[in-house]
Amino acid sequence: ACIDRFPTGTCKHVKKGGSCKNSQKYRINCAKTCGLCH
């Protein structure tokens, strides 16, 4: 599983919530942990 550094959830959860589009820190973190955050 692809878990990011934020305790709020996995990259999948972040992507579903739209945070990747709205937050640069989530995009950067997801890129480090599990590839591009679309």
From Swiss-Prot:
Gene3D superfamilies for this protein: ShTK domain-like (1.10.10.1870)
Top-level taxon of the source organism: Eukaryota
Cystine pairs: 2-37, 11-30, 20-34
ShKT domain residues: 2-37
SMART domains: ShKT
Cellular component GO terms, alphabetical: extracellular region; nematocyst
Family recorded in the similarity comment: Belongs to the sea anemone type 1 potassium channel toxin family. Type 1b subfamily.
Function summary: Inhibits voltage-gated potassium channels (IC(50)=405.0 nM for rKCNA1/Kv1.1, IC(50)=0.03 nM for rKCNA2/Kv1.2, IC(50)=1.31 nM for rKCNA6/Kv1.6, IC(50)=74.11 nM for hKCNA3/Kv1.3, and IC(50)=247.69 nM for insect Shaker IR). Binds the Shaker IR channels in a voltage-independent manner.
Record-given protein name: Kappa-actitoxin-Bcs3a
Source lineage: Eukaryota, Metazoa, Cnidaria, Anthozoa, Hexacorallia
